[in-house]
């Protein structure tokens, strides 16, 4: 009987503790890091629209913000291996007899032997790079809707330029989707209209 009443008291205490505590909106915080710039703050500068578009193009050619080692777009793989066009070329050419890489960087020989799996670091790097590129394009398109531009007071020539930038971002996204479909078959289709998260 004592054991039974002890369990009831313990259960009652736990239920009370869980129901009386709350986060008090602790998760609804703005980052305090001075290096983090939120979209609302970034796009207050009219030049930022063109700069972000330039980053979308640069995503095809560079692997991060700083060069060979530092601030990569994608972590978990050497920045030299995570560059979009390099990975795309490897997947398209090294898997044929058109190109041969005679050294054994990581799982690169698997390309020659036609023995690759999703755990291959190069396959994963290209998949992640394509997802990153599509996500970046979607973020730009999400931040340049008519409603957001109107709310920021964007008018005139800048508004016209941004409409052109949006078309370019859509093209870059379509290019990445075409690569994804060619290389991976079925691929998740996400646009700027889809909510962030799951």
Give a label for each model feature:
Residues 25-28, 181-189:
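Proline-centered turn/helix-capping motifs that create local helix->coil transitions or kinks
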Residues 193-195:
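Hydrophobic, small-residue-rich alpha-helical packing segments that form membrane-like cores
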Residues 1-32:
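Bacterial Sec-dependent N-terminal signal peptides
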Residues 68-74, 150-155, 187-190:
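Short, glycine/acidic-rich hinge or "gate" loops at secondary-structure transitions
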Residues 23-84:
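Membrane-proximal, proline-rich intrinsically disordered regions
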Residues 1, 23-25, 56, 137, ...:
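Terminal processing/anchoring signals of secreted or surface-associated proteins
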Residues 3, 23-24, 82, 100, ...:
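Long, intrinsically disordered, low-complexity segments
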Residues 46, 50, 58-64, 98-184:
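Conserved, well-structured interaction surfaces
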């Amino acid at each position: 009987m004592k054991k039974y009443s002890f369990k009831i008291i313990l259960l009652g205490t736990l239920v009370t503790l869980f129901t009386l505590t709350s986060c008090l909106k602790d998760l609804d915080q703005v980052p305090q890091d001075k290096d983090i710039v939120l979209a609302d703050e970034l796009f207050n500068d009219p030049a930022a629209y063109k700069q972000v578009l330039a980053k979308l193009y640069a995503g095809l050619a560079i692997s991060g913000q700083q060069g060979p080692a530092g601030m990569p777009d994608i972590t978990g793989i050497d920045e030299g291996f995570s560059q979009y066009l390099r990975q795309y070329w490897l997947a398209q050419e090294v898997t044929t007899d058109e190109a041969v890489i005679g050294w054994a960087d990581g799982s690169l020989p698997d390309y020659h032997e036609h023995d690759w799996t999703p755990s291959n670091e190069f396959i994963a790097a290209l998949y992640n790079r394509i997802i990153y590129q599509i996500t970046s394009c979607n973020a730009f398109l999400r931040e340049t809707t008519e409603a957001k531009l109107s709310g920021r007071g964007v008018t005139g020539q800048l508004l016209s330029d941004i409409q052109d930038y949006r078309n370019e971002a859509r093209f870059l996204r379509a290019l990445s989707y075409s690569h994804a479909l060619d290389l991976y078959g079925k691929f998740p289709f996400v646009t700027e209209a889809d909510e962030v998260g799951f």
